[in-house]
């Protein structure tokens, strides 16, 4: 019992001594740095220890847990690599293949062929002949198509008739050249105005005109027969063609009357002749004849055209040769092939799906492309290379056609054959290609671009990618060499502290020690993380001796026994408390545990410092590289072809189509205008014709009368519409109104003053103006007038005698006036028109004779 109490007594004395020493030290150091309130308090005892809670503090845990890594012998053995082999750097997974490439582009040039145009040009000249000079007033021209029978005559004899017969509105009109009224043939000669793409042959080079008689107008007629051999062009898909003078024909040049080619004109005006013979050239007599297998004729009101009809497949080709590349590298990406040519400085992208060689559009270029590939191979590769495959066709994203012939060196092929023989396998060496084509490569021929800028851009990108990947390969190789050198450094440092080096390398806590030339590894034993506590005081019981690292209290898992150790690096707990040093004053030490650091001043804990507030020494040089992956550039089109066409206000094709349509419409309207027979007369004539001969005769009579009446009415209407006629009618109406006004005034005057009107020769009495009488005199005169107002009444006989006397008097006065007029007229002294007009109301007016005339 006494043996048990003695150790307890010694432990109690030690605890009291440590408490007193810590209190005195805390008081001494408090003069420099303030301490926390818990340092001056007495806490409860820690279980299974003689320490109290105020003498320790808890620490946190971060990446590495608190563990004990001291061991006697490890279970795993490791060694450092002696030689490190650096593998070759391959940025992307690409398979390269060498070959020959021939590129064809879409032929945008139109199909060109010859067209013969037959026309008769009527020129009407009008002139006026004066006394000494003739004046040309102008001319007009009219283009007419040569009849079909006359076209055959021209193609046989190189001659054309000088007359034109037309039927307009049921009437026949005939025009002769030079108004000769003789129908004869004329020789076709070459015109002086032919050019490189057109040749014209005419019958008249100079126009003729004969002036008329003096003060007369004259109109002359010239009939010129013209045959034009010109070129026409038709663009894919060959639905119409355009002649060099701008005439648009909405017919496919390959339409033969029975195939499915486009035809948009009047079918009644189109005909086809097989084995048609015609002269080889115009302008000469006795020209040789040439047979044409199939000739098409199309007639318009102003021209008749003919051209040779041929097969489209034998005379047109949708593609034409563009470029060839003798040295081409093909690389395979996920969905596409890249054809890179350094001579063309371009890279072309195609899908992995091959084109169908039996397509009719490729028949015209397939044989030529194969011959060209074989020629290049025989001249450049035949000695050292062999063909490693057949010719294949691909379409690029820009609409180009690529013919590809893969080649391979003979030495490489021999090595492959040896490898195949060694492995005793019959597997094909041909690489399996994906049949899934890229969605962007399925373009129709109407959507492709007409530019290859995208190919040059793709080549630029691939070139840069190769340069960058080469640089990355060099960096990777240099990095590998640096790792070899770093390994040697780690191996030498591991001899000093193997556990620290191995923990840093494997990024986890490891216990390591050298056992000869190898390293023995053991797993660290983790302790109860919540039981880890650090003493605040780093001083020992011996004077002048302090711990070199803080003392730690901990317990193992599933154990309550408290162990003592010292805090190592990265939360490692070092077994034992034998790591001491001589105390140094003043002293400042900071120890890292978890995510925090703990500051000890003069070997006493002062405060906790956040780890983020302490700067780190960054020796890491990061290397973050990624290889450039494949990127397929797409051929972008800012505006489509239709948008570019519609953005221009002038569209030549539409303008010419509209112009030709307008011309045909005007000719049709002209025929309707000249048809002057009214519809009702046509209906009446049809009705009368159905009644037999009598009805037809009656209809002719009615039509003649109706035509005469209609002609008279049209003449009157035409006269009124004429400016001179309208002015004449207005003057006539004014004259009629004037006559009516004079008659009205005469009748009014006769009604108001009949005596003066019927007896103008009776002179009325002269009125004498006197002063008015006085009142008495006026009364007297009134009495006298009343007395004399009683008049005598006359009988009917007397009235009759008076009328006879008046008649006799009137006759005498009129005879006397006529006699006087005759006398004055004989003497040259008649009254003028103005005098008679001025004195028309005064009957019997005569000019007074002077004394000399008497």
Curated annotation (Swiss-Prot):
Entries under Pfam families matching the protein: Glycoprot_B_PH1 (PF17416), Glycoprot_B_PH2 (PF17417), Glycoprotein_B (PF00606)
First and last residue of the signal peptide: 1-30
Positions in the Virion surface compartment: 31-723
Disulfide bond sites: 69-524, 86-480, 160-225, 317-364, 546-583
Gene Ontology terms: biological process: symbiont entry into host cell; virion attachment to host cell
Annotated glycan sites: 40, 48, 60, 183, 256, 275, 314, 356, 378, 382, 390, 423, 426, 442, 558, 595
Transmembrane parts of this sequence: 724-744
Segments for region (Involved in fusion and/or binding to host membrane): 127-133, 212-219
InterPro entries per record: Glycoprot_B_PH1, Glycoprot_B_PH2, Glycoprot_B_PH2_sf, Glycoprotein_B_ecto_C, Herpes_Glycoprot_B
Subcellular location: Virion membrane; Host cell membrane; Host endosome membrane; Host Golgi apparatus membrane
Major localisation: virion
Site feature location: Cleavage: 433-434
Keywords tagged on the record: Disulfide bond, Glycoprotein, Host cell membrane, Host endosome, Host Golgi apparatus, Host membrane, Host-virus interaction, Membrane, Signal, Transmembrane, Transmembrane helix, Viral attachment to host cell, Viral envelope protein, Virion, Virus entry into host cell
Topological domain spans for side Intravirion: 745-854
GO cellular component: host cell endosome membrane; host cell Golgi membrane; host cell plasma membrane; membrane; viral envelope; virion membrane
Post-translational modification note: A proteolytic cleavage by host furin generates two subunits that remain linked by disulfide bonds.
Topology in membrane: Single-pass type I membrane protein
Region: Hydrophobic membrane proximal region, residue numbers: 669-721, 700-720
Keyword Disulfide bond in annotation: yes
Its job: Envelope glycoprotein that forms spikes at the surface of virion envelope. Essential for the initial attachment to heparan sulfate moieties of the host cell surface proteoglycans. Involved in fusion of viral and cellular membranes leading to virus entry into the host cell. Following initial binding to its host receptors, membrane fusion is mediated by the fusion machinery composed at least of gB and the heterodimer gH/gL. May be involved in the fusion between the virion envelope and the outer nuclear membrane during virion egress.
Family: Belongs to the herpesviridae glycoprotein B family.
Quaternary structure, from the entry: Homotrimer; disulfide-linked. Binds to heparan sulfate proteoglycans. Interacts with gH/gL heterodimer.
Protein name as annotated: Envelope glycoprotein B
Species of provenance: Rhesus cytomegalovirus (strain 68-1)
Gene: gB
């Amino acid at each position: 019992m006494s043996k048990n109490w003695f150790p307890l007594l010694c432990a109690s004395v030690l605890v009291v001594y440590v408490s007193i020493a810590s209190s005195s030290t805390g008081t001494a150091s408090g003069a420099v740095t303030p301490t926390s309130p818990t340092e001056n308090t007495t806490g409860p005892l820690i279980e299974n220890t003689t320490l109290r809670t105020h003498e320790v503090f808890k620490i946190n845990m971060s990446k590495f847990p608190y563990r004990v890594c001291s061991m006697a012998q490890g279970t795993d053995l490791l060694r450092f690599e002696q030689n490190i082999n650096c593998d070759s750097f391959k940025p992307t997974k690409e398979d390269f293949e060498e070959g020959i490439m021939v590129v064809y582009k879409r032929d945008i040039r139109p199909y060109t062929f010859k067209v013969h145009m037959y026309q008769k040009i009527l020129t009407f000249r009008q002139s006026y002949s004066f006394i000494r000079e003739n004046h040309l007033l102008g001319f007009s021209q009219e283009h007419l198509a040569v009849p079909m029978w006359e076209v055959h005559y021209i193609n046989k004899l190189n001659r054309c008739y000088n007359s034109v017969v037309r039927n307009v509105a049921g009437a026949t009109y005939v025009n002769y050249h030079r108004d000769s009224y003789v129908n004869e043939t004329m020789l076709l000669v070459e015109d002086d105005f032919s050019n490189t793409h057109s040749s014209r042959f005419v019958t008249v080079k100079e126009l003729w005109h004969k002036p008329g008689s003096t003060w007369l107008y004259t109109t002359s007629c010239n009939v010129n027969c013209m045959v034009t051999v010109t070129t026409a062009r038709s663009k894919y898909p060959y639905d119409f063609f355009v002649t060099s003078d701008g005439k648009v024909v909405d017919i496919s040049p390959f339409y033969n009357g029975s195939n499915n080619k486009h035809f948009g004109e009047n079918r009644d005006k189109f005909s086809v002749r097989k084995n048609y013979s015609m002269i080889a050239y115009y302008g000469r007599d006795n020209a040789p004849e040439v047979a044409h297998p199939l000739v098409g004729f199309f007639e318009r009101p102003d021209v008749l055209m003919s051209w040779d009809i041929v097969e489209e497949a034998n005379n047109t080709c949708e593609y034409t040769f563009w470029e060839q590349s003798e040295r081409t590298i093909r690389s395979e990406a996920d969905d596409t092939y890249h054809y890179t040519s350094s001579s063309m400085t371009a890279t072309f992208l195609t899908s992995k799906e091959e084109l169908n060689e039996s397509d009719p559009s490729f028949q015209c270029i397939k044989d030529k492309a194969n011959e060209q590939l074989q020629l290049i191979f025989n001249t450049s590769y035949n000695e050292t290379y062999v063909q490693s495959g057949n010719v294949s066709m691909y379409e690029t994203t820009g609409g180009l056609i690529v013919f590809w012939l893969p080649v391979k060196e003979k030495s490489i092929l021999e090595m492959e054959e040896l490898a195949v023989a060694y492995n005793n396998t019959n597997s094909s060496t041909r690489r399996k290609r994906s049949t899934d084509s890229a969605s962007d490569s399925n373009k129709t021929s109407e959507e492709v671009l007409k530019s290859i800028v995208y190919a040059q851009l793709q080549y630029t990108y691939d070139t840069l990618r190769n340069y960058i990947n080469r640089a990355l390969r060099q960096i990777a190789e240099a990095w590998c060499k640096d790792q070899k050198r770093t390994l040697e450094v780690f191996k030498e440092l591991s001899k000093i502290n193997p556990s620290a080096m191995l923990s840093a390398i494997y990024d986890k806590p490891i216990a390591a020690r050298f056992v000869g030339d190898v390293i023995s590894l053991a797993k660290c034993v983790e302790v109860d993380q919540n039981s880890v506590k650090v003493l605040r005081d780093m001083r020992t019981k011996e004077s002048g001796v302090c711990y070199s690292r803080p003392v730690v209290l901990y317990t193992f898992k599933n154990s309550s026994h408290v162990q003592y150790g010292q805090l190592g690096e990265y939360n490692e707990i070092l077994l034992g408390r034998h790591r001491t040093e001589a105390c140094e004053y003043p002293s400042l030490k900071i120890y890292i545990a978890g995510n925090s650091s703990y500051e000890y001043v003069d070997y006493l804990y002062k405060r906790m410092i956040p780890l983020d507030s302490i700067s780190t020494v960054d020796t890491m040089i990061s290397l973050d590289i990624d290889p450039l992956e494949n990127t397929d550039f797409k051929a972008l089109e800012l505006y489509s072809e239709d948008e570019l066409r519609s953005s221009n206000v002038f569209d030549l094709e539409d303008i010419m189509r509209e112009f030709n349509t307008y011309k045909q419409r005007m000719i049709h309207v002209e025929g309707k205008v000249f048809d002057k027979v009214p519809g009702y007369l046509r209906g009446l004539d049809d009705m009368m014709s159905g009644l037999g001969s009598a009805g037809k005769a009656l209809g002719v009579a009615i039509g003649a009368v109706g035509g005469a009446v209609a002609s008279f009415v049209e003449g009157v209407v035409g006269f009124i519409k004429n400016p001179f006629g309208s002015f004449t009618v207005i003057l006539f109406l004014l004259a009629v109104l004037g006559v009516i006004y004079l008659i009205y005034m005469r009748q009014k005057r006769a009604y108001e003053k009949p005596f003066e009107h019927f007896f103008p020769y009776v002179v009325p009495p002269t009125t004498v103006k006197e002063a008015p009488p006085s009142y008495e005199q006026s009364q007297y005169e009134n009495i006298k007038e009343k007395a004399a107002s009683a008049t005598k009444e006359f009988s009917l006989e007397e009235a009759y005698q008076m009328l006879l006397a008046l008649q006799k008097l009137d006759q005498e006065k009129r005879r006397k006036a006529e006699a006087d007029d005759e006398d004055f007229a004989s003497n040259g002294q008649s009254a003028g028109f103005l005098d008679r007009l001025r004195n028309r109301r005064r009957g019997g007016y005569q000019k007074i004779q002077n004394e000399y005339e008497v």
